[in-house]
Amino acid sequence: LYEMLNRFRGKLKMAIATGSPNKFLRIVLDKLKIEEYFDVLQSSDEIGEGKPSPEIYLKAAQKLKVLPSECVVLEDSCNGALSGKRAGCYTIAVPSEYTYKQDFSFVRYIARDLYDAAGHIESLMSLQREHNTIL
């Protein structure tokens, strides 16, 4: 996790968009010491609907001041991935040991792990630079 965060620090705006309440998000951020990496923290407290509603990703994109189509979403659950897709984000599934049997066929990319996801994001960034466009 830390390697991936450091890899993109200063290169991409980063946000957390979690279906958990802010108090739980704060516990995790404090334990892992990762809050400094993120430009936006979006918890379910400000959102009327849970995932798979796109609302949480739309709100995070708005706070980042970017279009949803300019966002890459990493998700480990089918409902979360569907939320990202419905928001119009480029969605990457990173299934966990608990969700790997779920059907992620609707996402743009299924990563084996965070390293694979990071490599894919870097290839998207490279394509964007070459063609001066957002995928």
Regions found by a protein language model. Give the residues of each.
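Glycine-centered short loops/turns at secondary-structure junctions
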Residues: K11-L12, G88
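Hydrophobic beta-strand core positions in alpha/beta domains
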Residues: A15-I16, A93
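A residue-level structural signature of the nucleotidyltransferase/glycosyltransferase Rossmann-like core
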Residues: K13-M14, Y109
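Internal catalytic-core helix/loop-beta-alpha segment
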Residues: L5-F8, M14
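Asp-based, Mg2+/Mn2+-dependent phosphohydrolase catalytic module
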Residues: Y2, N6, N22, R26-L135
